[in-house]
Amino acid sequence: MLQLRSPPPATSSPSSAVSFPTLAPRLLPLRRRRRGAGSQLGGKTSSAVRASSAAAPGATEPEVMVEVAHREVARALASLAEARLGARLLPSAVPPDVAEFRSGGGAGNAVGSLDVRRGAPGSTIDFMLQSSLHCKVPNGAIDITSLLIFLNASTDAPHFLMEFIQGSPTSIVVLLDLLPRKDLALHPEYIERYYENTQVDKQREKVEELPQARPYRSRSLFVRSTFSLTAILMSIDCGQGGEGTLEEIVRGQLATAARALLQIWLDSCADHTSEMEEGERENMIKRDQIVRSKSIEVDLTSNLPRMFGPDVADRVIAEIQKAFGVQEA
């Protein structure tokens, strides 16, 4: 789920996966967004952040959030989801030091933002989570943007997941899926309802047609097992000098596929309630908890402390654990 590792190196150069864009990116200091306001993953710096990140004379300037194409795509889709879900989402209650955070006591090489909106009582929504990370590394930077919308136990409908992992100006990893909540081999009717009837696989086929696309496989076998057979798990590599091509693909084919997948989820999953036997519901809840706990273990506890330090990482992970409804290990 929340992938906090750099993408695999591009085939053209061992270091290209972490090379910094040669194009001049727009730099966005973090901004705490108003509770209940429209989706924002970047903007003007609040006074609190300015105070915490002020560098002494001669000190290294604090890292700022870089505005890349996939963050704009994520903001647009988050706004679409919020507009559609409306009052089914409660205002954000994420504390300020988790809504915006950075490494090194304010002048480090990594910055991030996290926003979580819980589902209102009586809705099918468990939570909607948005996160954005920018980490400077020796040969460049890594930028990760995530949008998760998870459903609660009133329905067995799939969750929505979108994640972009960019470690190079010419390459990106994209993860897009309706995450299944049942063993698909044991429930062919589940495949038919949410994956065949919705024709969701057409989006994967379109992305796979890109000559720059190749399959992406997580190093974790468990993580691989959680995705559906229609998941878009692709690495897009545009090669040397392909910055403009990658941006066109992100704003074009990837944005189109992500919007189509979200629309399918909003139309076919978000409002669907399910009649289930108690044992069946308990098994689904258990499966959800295992997937959530394992994703935190694999992707967060092993990587976030290295990027932000233990104190910041502990605060952020605790907030995500709260959203996921899992206990600290």
UniProtKB/Swiss-Prot annotation:
One Pfam family, short name: RCC_reductase
| Oxidoreductase recorded as keyword | yes
Among InterPro entries, the record links this protein to: RCC_reductase
Which residue intervals are annotated with compositional bias (Pro residues) in the record?
A: 1-11
> What does its record list under induction?
Induced by wounding and senescence in leaves.
User: Which GO CC terms are listed, alphabetically?
Assistant: chloroplast
Record keywords, A-Z: Chlorophyll catabolism, Chloroplast, Oxidoreductase, Plastid, Transit peptide
The organelle targeting sequence, given as a residue range: 1-50
Q: In which tissues is it expressed?
A: Expressed in leaves. Expressed at low levels in roots, stems, panicles and seeds.
Annotated residues that bind red chlorophyll catabolite are located at 163, 216-218, 299
Its UniProt entry gives the catalysed reaction(s) as: primary fluorescent chlorophyll catabolite + 2 oxidized [2Fe-2S]-[ferredoxin] = red chlorophyll catabolite + 2 reduced [2Fe-2S]-[ferredoxin] + 3 H(+)
Q: According to its UniProt record, in which pathway does this protein act?
A: Porphyrin-containing compound metabolism; chlorophyll degradation
Q: What is this protein called?
A: Red chlorophyll catabolite reductase 1, chloroplastic
Give the organism's phylogenetic lineage: Eukaryota, Viridiplantae, Streptophyta, Embryophyta, Tracheophyta
- What's the gene? RCCR1
